[in-house]
Amino acid sequence: MSRRSKPERRIPSADPIYNSVDVSKFINRVMRRGKKSLAERIFYSTINNIAERTNENGLEVFQKALTNATPLLEVKARRIGGSTYQVPIDVKPDRGFALASSWIIAAAKNRGGKSFVEKLTNELLDASNGNGAACKKREDTHRMAEANKAFAHYRY
């Protein structure tokens, strides 16, 4: 076992417009090939579209969508005595955010539509209402954890 201490967690700086670390992390997830300004333009356009469509604060809709898509449980493969069990484990907040944001972005990519801004807008609106592909993925994950609840004592 390593005797070195764990490195300090690097918290990304908050974004300049909403002063939110979550927004900054989400923009970094949207970013492709290092084009951060494009990712920021996509995200802020999406938030403006949401605000125009719903007459609500776009950032609140975004936060609600993330909350609805964040899983509380997931399964992890654990090998015991020659057989592999799917062991349900709790999801830590950072991992939950990472899963939810990647599911929302993947669902938006697979959606039909003209531009990515439009696709992401529709996916965030669906996720904030509790439906959409990202929320379905969360429900599938919870269903899998519930089905394998018998193996919870193998937790590590």
Residue ranges and their predicted role:
Residues 2-33, 37, 44-156:
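Strongly charged
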